[in-house]
């Protein structure tokens, strides 16, 4: 969606320095569903909503990639999201906040919803909510950044969806002058974004894991 390009012009300098963490999707699935796990999804969401800056890199990894094993997510194809996107296109930021809060309550780690809320809070000069959601966006996108180095197919960055891929590309300052080639795998698609000698490998994960 076009709002990504417009919005990321002022939030590109996001990524901090942090250690790469091995991505183990089966372990994440197990941890987030275990009631007594420190990485139980509901427990992490509670912490993420209240004090996002207290979330460490492993917790952020469970929050972002744990989305693949949830059934209660907001989709861009849903009518409620389409209404939110339409309000955004019309620059009706008060309505964006009203609608966005509802979808955020349902799916608080949805990058699309967070982006729209951020833009709306920026336009309405709501510094408190803006800062809160910036911290959330930072930790989720850092989880993507820490999933690899993007220099090869084996060490590709991993994203949950094509939409998240484009959000991440904007944050990496990858523009329309890059070309893309794709390779289908059993558990996802590898996209190679190329400009001259520069290549960035991103793996879009399938939601249904059979491995």
Q: What does each of the following model-derived ranges do?
A:
Residues 20-90, 144, 152-211:
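N-terminal alpha-helical interaction modules that lie
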Residues 1-23:
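Bacterial Sec-dependent N-terminal signal peptides
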């Amino acid at each position: 969606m076009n709002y990504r390009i417009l919005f990321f012009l002022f939030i590109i300098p996001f990524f901090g320095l942090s250690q790469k963490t091995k991505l183990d999707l089966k372990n994440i699935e197990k941890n987030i569903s275990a009631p007594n796990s420190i990485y139980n999804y509901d427990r992490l969401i509670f912490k993420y909503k209240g004090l996002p800056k207290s979330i460490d890199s492993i917790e952020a990894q469970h929050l972002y990639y744990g989305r693949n094993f949830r059934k209660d997510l907001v989709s861009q194809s849903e009518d409620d999201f389409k209404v939110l996107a339409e309000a955004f296109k019309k620059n009706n930021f008060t309505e964006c906040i009203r609608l966005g809060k509802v979808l955020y309550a349902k799916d608080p780690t949805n990058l699309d919803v967070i982006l729209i809320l951020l833009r709306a809070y920026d336009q309405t000069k709501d510094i408190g909510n803006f800062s809160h959601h910036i911290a959330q966006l930072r930790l989720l996108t850092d989880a993507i950044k820490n999933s690899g180095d993007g220099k090869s197919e084996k060490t590709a960055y991993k994203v949950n969806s094509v939409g998240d891929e484009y959000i991440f590309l904007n944050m990496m300052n990858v523009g329309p002058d890059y070309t893309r080639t794709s390779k289908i795998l059993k558990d996802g698609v590898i996209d190679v974004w190329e400009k001259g000698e520069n290549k960035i490998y991103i793996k879009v994960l399938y939601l249904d894991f059979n491995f």
